[in-house]
Amino acid sequence: MAIKKYKPTSNGRRGMTTSDFAEITTDQPEKSLLAPLHKKGGRNNQGKLTVRHQGGGHKRQYRVIDFKRDKDGIPGRVATVEYDPNRSANIALINYVDGEKRYILAPKGIQVGTEIMSGPEADIKVGNALPLINIPVGTVVHNIELKPGKGGQLVRSAGTSAQVLGKEGKYVLVRLNSGEVRMILSACRASIGQVGNEQHELINVGKAGRSRWKGIRPTVRGSVMNPNDHPHGGGEGRAPIGRKSPMSPWGKPTLGFKTRKKKNKSDKFIVRRRKNK
């Protein structure tokens, strides 16, 4: 993937960048792997706003992704590499020899015609998926399960990767993209390689309208709201917030306030906390 820059022909174009989509081989998704995706606008089943800054955006269809990678022993070939509007990573359509088709996250370096395999006997090759116990120490992986058979939950965004550091009993030590070292059950599966589209983080949106196309609404400062909308709101003109520390919209301390539970169940699996960024 390369970044495409634009001439400043307008204020919206000045500084704007996009992907050149050189890795994308088709713009026609596999119809059998599409599902309807209804917009919620950040509302729950009572119609109440639960997630701010969501709404509008271009109509999308959901691509059904195989995060479980449980088609053991059956080889498949990459048919296409496609854009997915629902995630930062690209996806690859796999045609298996038994006729089934599935989408997977497209790892870096995968191309049309590449053969992939899942299962304990699969080779250590980019795109293959194996239980962590079968993956050598030092291997770069992505799409990691937290529970065997549940499907990959960790390391799925564009450009992310994790590394297998060691094996202790029924657990495998994995260093995540954040720097956190975590113990994961050795029966959990992971895919080999780094997630592709690694320059996604370098894209400059350029204008507010492009965020609206994605369904992202504006983020308004609390200090310009009314007192009934935000703890920082109210006052005459540019008034100070009038509190000891900044507050979230729900009255909780923010900007440095720790939000993780003090007795989180997953603490026993974390060997080293993530690096401060």
Curated annotation (Swiss-Prot):
The UniProt record lists the keyword rRNA-binding: yes
Bias kind Basic residues: ranges: 258-277
Pfam families per record: Ribosomal_L2, Ribosomal_L2_C
Keywords (A to Z) from UniProt: Ribonucleoprotein, Ribosomal protein, RNA-binding, rRNA-binding
Gene Ontology CC: large ribosomal subunit
Region (Disordered): 36-58, 219-277
One GO MF term: transferase activity
Transmembrane segments: none
Function noted in UniProt: One of the primary rRNA binding proteins. Required for association of the 30S and 50S subunits to form the 70S ribosome, for tRNA binding and peptide bond formation. It has been suggested to have peptidyltransferase activity; this is somewhat controversial. Makes several contacts with the 16S rRNA in the 70S ribosome.
Subunit organization: Part of the 50S ribosomal subunit. Forms a bridge to the 30S subunit in the 70S ribosome.
HAMAP family assigned: Ribosomal_uL2_B
Family: Belongs to the universal ribosomal protein uL2 family.
Protein name stated in the entry: Large ribosomal subunit protein uL2
Gene source species: Bacillus velezensis (strain DSM 23117 / BGSC 10A6 / LMG 26770 / FZB42) (Bacillus amyloliquefaciens subsp. plantarum)
